[in-house]
Structure formats: C-alpha cells, structure tokens
Amino acid sequence: MPVKSKAQPVSKASLKRLREEEEELEDSPSSSDFEQGSSQDGLSDGSDAEEDFEDVDSDDADAPRIAQWEPDDDDIYNKIEEEEEPKKQPSQLSALENNLRGLPLGALRKAQKALAQVQAESDSESESGDEESDEDSGSEVEEESTKPQKVEWISRDTKKHARANKHAPMEVTSKKPVSRKRTVVEVPKLVPRDPRFLPTAGEFKPEAFQKSYGFLAESRKEELKTLKETLAKARKAMSSCPAHLRDEREQEIERLERAVKRTESLVNKDRMDAIQQQALQRVKKEEKEKQKQGKGKWFLKQCEYQRAFLSGYELTCSPSGKTKGGTKGSLRSFVAGRWSPRSQESY
C-alpha cells in the first residue's frame, strides 16, 4: 500500500538542493535510456537503492519522501485460492462418484433419460440458430445425419396437458398406424351361425320337435322324483340336527323346495303341451276327412280351440273334473291365455 507523507515546512536549503537536482536531470541522457538503465540497475542492485534511500533520509529530514508500491494482501489470498482449487477438484469428483454408486439403478436410469432429453432439445435449438445465421450470411450449412425417431402408438396420452376440470375426459389420439400387410386375395369373413335358424333347416314343426326331443320330458319327471325324495330326507334329518348346523340345514331345505317348484312347473308345461298337440292333431284329422267329402277350408277359432283342448284334458284327468290346479273354470282361463294366432291356421 502507498505510504502517505505528512506535510512538513520546506527550508531554503532544501529548495536550493531541489533546483540543482532539476538542472542535473535536464543535462542527463534521454528518458528511455534512463528507464532502461534504471530498470536494470533496480533489478540487479536492490541493495544500492536501499542505501540511497537511507542516504536521502539521513541528509535531509525535511525532504519529500518517496513511497514504494507493495501488493495487497487480497491479491495474495486470491492467488493462493486459485492454486488450491485444482487440488480440491479431484476430491469433489470422488465424492460425487461415491454418492452415485449408492443410488439405485432405477433412479440413475431416469436421470439419464432426463439428461438425454434436455441435451437433444438444446442441440435442436442450437442447430436452428446456426441455420438462421448461415442463411443470413449465405454460408454453406453442413448436414448432419440423424436417425428417425421411433413413433410409439399408445392409447394413453404421454404428455401432461392441463384439463379444465379434473372430471373432464382425457384426450386420446385418433391416429393409428397403417397396416404393413397387403391384401392380395379377399377372404370372406367367417360369421358365426346357428343351424337351427337357417333357411335350409325348413319350417318349424311342433310335431317333429316333440318326437325328437320327447326324452326331455321323461328326464324332468325323473329329476322331480329324485328331488322330492331328497327333500323328504332333509326334512326328516332336521329334527335330529344339532343347533350349530340348523341354519345350514334350513338353507338347504329352502334350496331344495325352490328346485322342486321349478321342476314341477317344467313337468306341468310339458304335460300341457302334449295335451294341446294331441287335441290339435285330432281336430286336424277330423277336418281332413270332412274336406275329402267335399267340405271347404276351415279356420280354427278360439272357442273351438278351447273346446278341443278341454276335451283332450278331460280324457287325461279324473272323471270328477277336478285337477290339482283347480276346477274347469280356472282351466278355461288358463286355456284362453295359451291362445295364439298359430292356432288359426287353415285345415
């Protein structure tokens, strides 16, 4: 740091000495030679300069003092820090490597992908800036070979777009890849079909159906008989059932009762269908014999259908006219519900 000298009174002797020194300087050689000589002398003989300063101080205490520049302490500290920084770098790298080794592979993979994406974006921005500058200057642009990015076709949206409402539907792309397969020969598409409803199967005939699937009625009768026997055994075992199993046995009895009712309804339906078919066949046979004698076409009415059905039902029931379902009045209402336009066919 430069040393500031205090202002002191100047004597006549000192003024005279200063004038003599100025005259000597004017008579001395050029400034460049003086500087070169002084620099060389300063470098070679540092001790002589110190002695001269001491002589000046000793000759006249009132003469102006000359201050020597010295470097600041801050500059010294900065140089020391710059020398120490390259020494610290290897230790920091080793610490980072140790930290990265402790991380899981999944986290490292995610970080690698993020860095690659950021680097690609920065490269694209730099390339676009270079192209614009080259177009302005008219210089040639070097083309870099880049691989085409693979397009992934997925049903979900990879980019997170802000939605107006959290309950709003997600936007899904409508773009689909074109098939690489080329259709050379068009093959007819296979359509599932049911042979029962094809036109080649012909019209539905109840008589033929009854003859082909008549075994189903017999199997339902046997099933009903077995269910009734099982229900009777379950009710009998209920009396000697322990308390902790009573709920399960009651549920089992209820299930068997429902199965018996369902099977009974199927058996009764099969029996009614058989009676109806027999009554219609009998009426049809009688009308065909009358047509042979010269009678014209005849259409079955609802009242005649009920009469034929009741007559056939009476043949299969008891002579008293009572059935398990009720009397003849309730049976007539049942027959009226079974009337269908199919019964109006001509005979």
From Swiss-Prot:
Compartments where located: Nucleus, Nucleolus
Domain of life, per lineage: Eukaryota
Key word Ribonucleoprotein present: yes
Any coiled-coil regions, as ranges: 216-273
Stored Pfam families: RRP36
Region named Disordered: 1-187, 318-347
Family: Belongs to the RRP36 family.
Low complexity: bias regions: 36-46
Subunit structure: Associates with 90S and pre-40S pre-ribosomal particles.
The protein's name in its UniProt record: rRNA biogenesis protein RRP36
Organism: Coprinopsis cinerea (strain Okayama-7 / 130 / ATCC MYA-4618 / FGSC 9003)
Bias type Acidic residues, positions: 47-61, 122-143
Bias-annotated ranges (Basic and acidic residues): 76-88, 144-157
